[in-house]
């Protein structure tokens, strides 16, 4: 390191905390054979959705009398189906110990909104000129052309409006709401940064997948709904997606 650099070091990294919409798998039983079969069936319905998907394994819903979890085996099965385990949630001592043994972080129940973490919090910050705050809501993104299979459209910081058909294999993502004024045959993921008040509106529900703030339903579940093929509004209550007629 040069003398000049040591006298006036510039930071080369920044630590941040964040709240992201990450898929959470809540384990109800420790039967890994059944999990492997059921997970394979889910992946077959929407293979792209499960490709390299970050995952939190939630073991805190397991009954106290449920047997021990083969955590390495569980992580291996998830990885085989495209799910990349980042951490676990657990409250049983044996599950926490198993996570520590394989060097997996154990998370608290909830996260924090993104902010810069300053390790030297005791030092009084120097006053610097503040930049004008960026608007929280960005303009609505409007798409007028058909969205074809393989296309991905993202409305960052706001809503997405599509006034054309959405083909199978196409993917719509928005931090806010999604409106589709035409047949919705692809995937629609609203509130992808954790906005649980986001909604999805479409004139014809024929989607491969719908998701709000990480809670999702695939086409196999949607086809059983009596409003399949109808104009609908989709909202989230707790961890339940509600579908009602427009």
Curated annotation (Swiss-Prot):
Keywords: Cell cycle, Cell division, Septation
One Pfam family per UniProt: MinC_N
Domain of life: Bacteria
GO biological process: cell morphogenesis; division septum assembly; regulation of cell division; regulation of cell septum assembly
Family: Belongs to the MinC family.
Free-text function comment from the UniProt entry: Cell division inhibitor that blocks the formation of polar Z ring septums. Rapidly oscillates between the poles of the cell to destabilize FtsZ filaments that have formed before they mature into polar Z rings. Prevents FtsZ polymerization.
Oligomeric and partner information: Interacts with MinD and FtsZ.
Protein name from the UniProt record: Probable septum site-determining protein MinC
